UniProtKB/Swiss-Prot annotation:
It comes from the Bacteria. HAMAP family: EF_P (MF_00141). NCBIfam families: efp, PRK00529.1. CDD domains: S1_EF-P_repeat_1, S1_EF-P_repeat_2. SMART domains: EFP, Elong-fact-P_C. It is found in: Cytoplasm. SUPFAM superfamilies: Nucleic acid-binding proteins, Translation proteins SH3-like domain. Pathway: Protein biosynthesis; polypeptide chain elongation. Its main location: cytoplasm. One of its GO terms (molecular function) is translation elongation factor activity. One of its GO terms (biological process) is peptide biosynthetic process. Belongs to the elongation factor P family. This is Elongation factor P.
Length: 189
């Protein structure tokens, strides 16, 4: 396994501390007036989704986790577990809703996602940063609604609710940023 020092840390890097895999979500290099520089990071656990703050000083080391990402197809939710299939080997993997976390609200049947394995066990799902989803329910438009930058709530086919501009209608397919949970634009379909 690779080892990282303080200078190697950056946003998006995956590290392992005490046997738990984390992803660095925020990174700040601090150089105080007196004393040695250090790095303050916020790390998110792949196992339980909790975000922790950690400080690394010069000489501190952390390990690279034994993580493997594999592209798989989301099949269905049986109520307790979500079922995924490797499209090459047809091997199926079941992951609990708890392990999937926030990614679940963006998933629809047939979608290709990245499954994260730690030491051979499926521990999480990463959906694409931008997904195209159909609007299944939203308020109708009234004359004058298209003026200004007002928004209305819309329920998507995955069950997620996002704010959309008034000119977008029910039945249309839109592009959504899954990280921020925001409407981007209408999809070109």
């Amino acid at each position: 396994m690779a080892s990282y020092s303080m200078g190697d840390l950056k946003k998006g890097l995956k590290i392992e501390l005490d046997g738990v895999p984390y992803k660095i979500v925020e990174y700040q290099h601090v150089k105080p007036g007196k004393g040695a520089a250090f790095v303050r990071v916020k790390i998110k656990s792949f196992v339980n989704g909790k975000v922790l703050e950690k400080t690394f000083h010069a000489g501190d080391k952390c390990e690279s986790p034994n993580l493997v990402e594999k592209e798989m197809q989301y099949l269905y939710d049986d109520g307790e577990f979500c079922q995924f299939m490797d499209v090459e080997s047809y091997e199926q993997v079941a992951i609990s809703d708890e392990d999937i976390g926030e990614a679940k609200k963006w998933m629809i049947d047939g979608m290709m996602v990245q499954i994260l394995f730690h030491n051979g066990k499926a521990i999480g799902v990463e959906v694409p940063q931008v997904v195209e989803l159909k609007i299944v329910e939203t308020q109708p438009n009234f004359k004058g609604d298209t003026q200004g930058s007002n928004k209305k709530p819309a329920t998507l086919e995955s069950g997620a609710v996002v704010q959309i501009p008034f000119h977008v209608l029910e039945g249309e397919v839109i592009r959504v940023d899954t990280v921020r949970g925001e409407y981007i634009e209408r999809a070109n379909k």
